[in-house]
Regions:
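Short, surface-exposed linear patches
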Residues: 42-44, 93-97, 103-104, 188-193
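Extended surface/linker regions that mediate inter-domain or inter-protein docking
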Residues: 1-17, 25, 132-216
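Low-complexity, flexible helical/coil segments
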Residues: 55-59, 107-111, 203-207
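Catalytic cores of secreted or luminal carbohydrate-active enzymes
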Residues: 78-153
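General N-terminal targeting signals
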Residues: 37, 97-98, 182-187
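Residue-identity detector for glutamine
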Residues: 30, 40-41, 96, 133, ...
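Inter-heme linker and motif-flanking segments adjacent to c-type heme-binding CXXCH motifs
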Residues: 1-92
Length: 216
């Protein structure tokens, strides 16, 4: 859909005829944008102010908001405008032989290999103070099974001068973990002994964790 998007879907591509690389430029595969690696280090970013400056509005009172509110907070009030996006994924229900039904958007609510899904359209983002950096869950990090595990932990707070209120898509789900060692398990999904052949979580987790040299 981004080959020829409407102005409502993408104002730069739909109205101005931009190509992806006009914003996501770079050299030697160092593409501008918030990848997992660059987001952790807070480098290689670009934003609206790189083209529009931090005083883009005719009304000066609106420009005062740019000190604490990211441009996207107002200018991207919803996402998944034309196609549904997955917002929940429950691996714990995988492996069942049950009837697969589509939701109101025509998307599958279940897949035997992957479990239950929830899809949404015209989603209102969730908002967080963010300074452009993040921490990530690393393989083998200990978890508390009683709490929600954040795989992407955004940095920033109201007292951080580099933080702004920023919109995010939050993906929630359930996945397997090692109840003895209290870390997330990495199952082998495909190939010999993989979960998609055996539908045996323990066997698949053992093989997967062996591949990253961790006990299961």
């Amino acid at each position: 859909r981004l080959l020829n998007p409407s102005e409502e879907l993408d104002v730069h591509m739909g109205r101005a005829g931009f190509e992806c690389s006009e914003c996501h430029a770079g050299e030697s595969h160092q593409i501008l944008g918030a990848s997992h690696g660059s987001l952790q280090q807070g480098t290689n970013h670009f934003g609206c102010v790189d083209c529009h400056t931090d005083e883009p509005h005719v009304k000066k009172i609106l420009n005062k908001h740019t000190n604490s509110i990211a441009c996207e907070t107002c200018h991207i009030p919803t996402f998944a405008k034309e196609m549904a996006t997955k917002t929940y994924w429950d691996w714990s229900t995988a492996g069942q032989d049950k009837k697969v039904e589509n939701d109101e958007f025509g998307m599958p609510k279940y897949a035997k290999k992957k479990g239950d899904f929830v899809w949404e359209m015209n989603v209102i983002p969730e908002y967080s103070w963010h300074n452009g950096q993040a921490d990530y869950y690393k393989i083998g990090d200990e978890i508390n099974p009683e709490n929600v595990v954040k795989l992407n932990n955004l940095k920033g707070n109201i007292n951080d001068p580099n933080s702004k209120i920023t919109p995010f898509k939050v993906m929630r789900g359930k996945q397997i973990y090692d109840s003895k060692n209290n870390y997330l398990a990495i199952p082998k999904l495909f190939g010999k002994g993989g979960y998609w052949k055996t539908y045996d979580w323990n066997a698949a987790a053992k093989l997967g964790m062996e591949s990253v040299s961790l006990e299961y």
